[in-house]
Amino acid sequence: MAKITKEQFIESLKEMTIKEVMEFVDALKEEFGVDPSAVAVAATPVATEEVKTEVKLTLKAAGQQKVAVIKVVKDLLGLSLMDAKKLVDAAPSVLKEAIKPEEAEEYKAKLVAAGAEVSID
């Protein structure tokens, strides 16, 4: 039997009618015992990543510039200076819960700029 190239095979497929292609696919399934739906299922991702609509902002550590971090926490959360200091001293501590991811990123940027270590969960 003569071996044909991939290009020749594709050209042959182009010349076939839809019915002939369907018959060809059925013959391949039967000959090789292949079920194309099993391959399609395997190729589909099992789980998609869930987009969070609310996150939690946590202060992990104040870093070297504790006073600057206290001021930022005070301004962001509207706390008194003493309450902000207590919150920073108690790190790791939750600064805000159930906030929008965009807002959390904004807060994180300000805190990191002041020298804090922050996480968004």
Curated annotation (Swiss-Prot):
Domain of life: Bacteria
Pfam families tied to this protein: Ribosomal_L12, Ribosomal_L12_N
GO cellular component: cytosolic large ribosomal subunit
Function of the molecule: Forms part of the ribosomal stalk which helps the ribosome interact with GTP-bound translation factors. Is thus essential for accurate translation.
UniProt family annotation: Belongs to the bacterial ribosomal protein bL12 family.
Assembly mode: Homodimer. Part of the ribosomal stalk of the 50S ribosomal subunit. Forms a multimeric L10(L12)X complex, where L10 forms an elongated spine to which 2 to 4 L12 dimers bind in a sequential fashion. Binds GTP-bound translation factors.
Alphabetically ordered keywords of this record: Ribonucleoprotein, Ribosomal protein
Gene name tied to this protein: rplL
Lineage, opening ranks: Bacteria, Bacillati, Mycoplasmatota, Mycoplasmoidales, Metamycoplasmataceae
Organism: Mesomycoplasma hyopneumoniae (strain J / ATCC 25934 / NCTC 10110)
Protein's name according to its UniProt entry: Large ribosomal subunit protein bL12
Ribosomal protein among keywords: yes
Keyword Ribonucleoprotein attributed: yes
GO biological process assignments: translation
Molecular function via GO: mRNA binding; structural constituent of ribosome
Signal peptide extent: none
